[in-house]
Every structure is written in structure tokens, then in C-alpha cells.
């Protein structure tokens, strides 16, 4: 009677009947051996791909993906340029660490959330209980300005004689 040889397990089965083969193939050791065989095969394929890519790169057939590309570079966003600017003093005078939005904006660093970018809280005295430059909030709560811009309060009066952030100070008349 012919015996059945299992390549994965490197063993001969006692009989060549379908029921013996089925029982063997459902066994834990056989399944582990099959899993190990294909893991080893995948590692060999990955190493072969790495070796082929390295050889092609050394031969000059593949361009360096980390080399700077010719052409214009995209400038960083406006809120990422330059040092932090001082914020004009409010009715109570300038407080400690009252600097305008710096490289991370007034609300801290940007993080990617499931629905797009979100801002994290910024540690330090700049974001106290009332936040920077915020007056009484009233019943409506704070309103957000443009992304990277300061928080606005609906009850705060507008000061027209103050220069806008980023503008030079006005000359006295």
C-alpha cells in the first residue's frame, strides 16, 4: 500500500486514504507547519524584492526618492511663518506671556483626527480660564475665527484704532 508524504510536515502518513489525509490536514501541528512554510516563503520573497531594488538603485536604474525635486517648493502655511507677534494690550493691560499665535497657532499643535485636523490644548499660562484676549462670553459662548486665528467673543467691542496683527503700528495724527 502506498504511503502519503506531507511536504509541510516532512513525514509519511500511515495510509494514503482520504480520511487519513483529511485527519492529518486538520491537525494542529500540520496547520502550524503550513503557516510556518508560507511565512518563510513570504520572507524570502520580500528579501528577493529588497535585493532586486537595491541592485537596481546601485546600477542607477532607479532615481533617489529622497533627492530634492527640481522646481519651486511649496511655501509653509501663513501661520507657520516668522516668530510670534505681540498682541496689543487689552483693557486690563498686557498679561504675562501674551504673545500672538506662533508656529502652532493660539490653540496648540495640530493633530490628525478621524474627521480631519484638530488642535490640541496648549500648555502654559497663555491659555488660562478665560483664554487670551477674551472678554465676557454671555449666553452664546465663544466663536471660533479662521483656522489659526484667535478666538472671538460675541460680546467684545471692536477696537478700530488698533492695527491688525502683522501690520506696522499707525503713526499718531
UniProtKB/Swiss-Prot annotation:
GO MF term list: mRNA binding; pre-mRNA 5'-splice site binding; U1 snRNA binding; zinc ion binding
Compartments where located: Nucleus
InterPro entries to which the protein is assigned, alphabetical: Matrin/U1-C_Znf_C2H2, Matrin/U1-like-C_Znf_C2H2, U1-CZ_Znf_C2H2, U1_snRNP-C, Znf_C2H2_sf
Superkingdom field: Eukaryota
Chief place of localization: nucleus
Gene Ontology cellular component annotations, sorted alphabetically: commitment complex; U1 snRNP; U2-type prespliceosome
Pro residues biased stretches: 73-94
Zinc fingers, Matrin-type class: 4-36
Signal peptide residue numbers: none
Annotated TM spans: none
Gene3D superfamilies documented for this protein: Classic Zinc Finger
Biological-process GO terms, alphabetical: mRNA 5'-splice site recognition; spliceosomal snRNP assembly
Annotated spans, Disordered: 72-100
Keywords: Metal-binding, Nucleus, Ribonucleoprotein, RNA-binding, Zinc, Zinc-finger
Subunit annotation: U1 snRNP is composed of the 7 core Sm proteins B/B', D1, D2, D3, E, F and G that assemble in a heptameric protein ring on the Sm site of the small nuclear RNA to form the core snRNP, and at least 3 U1 snRNP-specific proteins U1-70K, U1-A and U1-C. U1-C interacts with U1 snRNA and the 5' splice-site region of the pre-mRNA.
Family: Belongs to the U1 small nuclear ribonucleoprotein C family.
Function: Component of the spliceosomal U1 snRNP, which is essential for recognition of the pre-mRNA 5' splice-site and the subsequent assembly of the spliceosome. U1-C is directly involved in initial 5' splice-site recognition for both constitutive and regulated alternative splicing. The interaction with the 5' splice-site seems to precede base-pairing between the pre-mRNA and the U1 snRNA. Stimulates commitment or early (E) complex formation by stabilizing the base pairing of the 5' end of the U1 snRNA and the 5' splice-site region.
Name this polypeptide is given: U1 small nuclear ribonucleoprotein C
Species the sequence originates in: Pediculus humanus subsp. corporis
UniProt lineage: Eukaryota, Metazoa, Ecdysozoa, Arthropoda, Hexapoda
Amino acid at each position: 500500500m502506498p504511503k502519503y508524504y506531507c511536504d509541510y510536515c516532512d513525514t509519511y502518513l500511515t495510509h494514503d486514504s482520504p480520511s487519513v489525509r483529511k485527519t492529518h490536514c486538520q491537525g494542529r501541528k500540520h496547520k502550524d507547519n503550513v503557516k510556518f512554510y508560507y511565512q518563510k516563503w513570504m520572507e524570502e520573497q520580500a528579501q528577493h524584492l529588497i535585493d532586486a531594488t537595491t541592485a537596481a538603485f546601485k546600477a542607477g536604474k532607479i532615481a533617489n526618492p529622497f533627492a530634492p525635486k527640481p522646481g519651486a517648493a511649496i511655501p509653509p502655511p501663513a501661520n507657520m511663518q516668522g516668530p510670534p507677534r505681540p498682541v496689543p494690550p487689552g483693557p486690563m493691560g498686557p498679561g504675562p506671556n501674551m504673545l500672538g499665535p506662533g508656529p502652532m497657532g493660539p490653540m496648540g499643535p495640530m493633530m490628525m483626527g478621524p474627521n480631519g485636523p484638530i488642535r490640541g490644548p496648549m500648555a502654559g499660562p497663555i491659555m488660562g480660564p478665560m483664554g487670551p484676549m477674551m472678554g465676557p462670553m454671555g449666553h452664546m459662548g465663544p466663536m471660533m475665527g479662521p483656522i489659526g486665528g484667535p478666538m472671538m467673543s460675541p460680546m467684545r467691542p471692536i477696537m478700530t484704532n488698533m492695527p491688525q496683527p502683522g501690520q506696522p503700528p499707525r503713526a499718531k495724527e
